[in-house]
UniProtKB/Swiss-Prot annotation:
Location(s), subcellular: Cell membrane
Family (UniProt): Belongs to the complex I subunit 4L family.
InterPro entries found in the cross-reference section: NADH_UbQ_OxRdtase_chain4L/K, NUOK/Mnh_C1-like
Protein name: NADH-quinone oxidoreductase subunit K
Role, per record: NDH-1 shuttles electrons from NADH, via FMN and iron-sulfur (Fe-S) centers, to quinones in the respiratory chain. The immediate electron acceptor for the enzyme in this species is believed to be ubiquinone. Couples the redox reaction to proton translocation (for every two electrons transferred, four hydrogen ions are translocated across the cytoplasmic membrane), and thus conserves the redox energy in a proton gradient.
Catalytic activity annotation: a quinone + NADH + 5 H(+)(in) = a quinol + NAD(+) + 4 H(+)(out)
Entry keyword Translocase: yes
Gene name linked to the record: nuoK
Subunit organization: NDH-1 is composed of 13 different subunits. Subunits NuoA, H, J, K, L, M, N constitute the membrane sector of the complex.
GO molecular function: NADH:ubiquinone reductase (non-electrogenic) activity; quinone binding
Organism: Buchnera aphidicola subsp. Schizaphis graminum (strain Sg)
Length: 100
């Protein structure tokens, strides 16, 4: 069984990896992937904490977090598809410039 420290440390590393990628990347699709990594890191922390205290609440919250992440990802991908069809780019810097 994995210890609480190691599980939370892995979750922290994944969260920092996602946050760093979110800050560094300029492509909206990669930013969405970074957000998904961060959400999965938080869900991992819930499962590890629930397992440590022998409570099933962490696993129930994990199921909730995964369903929320799936719905968020599907809506975001639909919006990204429409954005790409209109602008022909997913670069956040090109999209933030005003066209007139």
């Amino acid at each position: 069984m994995i210890s609480l420290f190691h599980g939370l440390f892995l979750s922290l590393i994944l969260f920092i990896l996602g946050l760093t990628s979110l800050i560094v990347r300029r492509n909206i699709l990669f930013m969405l992937i970074s957000l998904e990594i961060m959400m999965n890191a938080a869900a991992l922390a819930l499962v590890v904490s629930g397992s440590y205290w022998k409570q099933s609440d962490g696993q129930i919250m994990y199921i909730l977090a995964i369903t929320l992440a799936a719905s968020e990802a599907s809506i975001a991908l639909a919006l990204l598809l429409q954005l790409y069809r209109r602008q022909r780019t997913l670069n956040i810097n090109a999209l933030s410039e005003m066209s007139g």
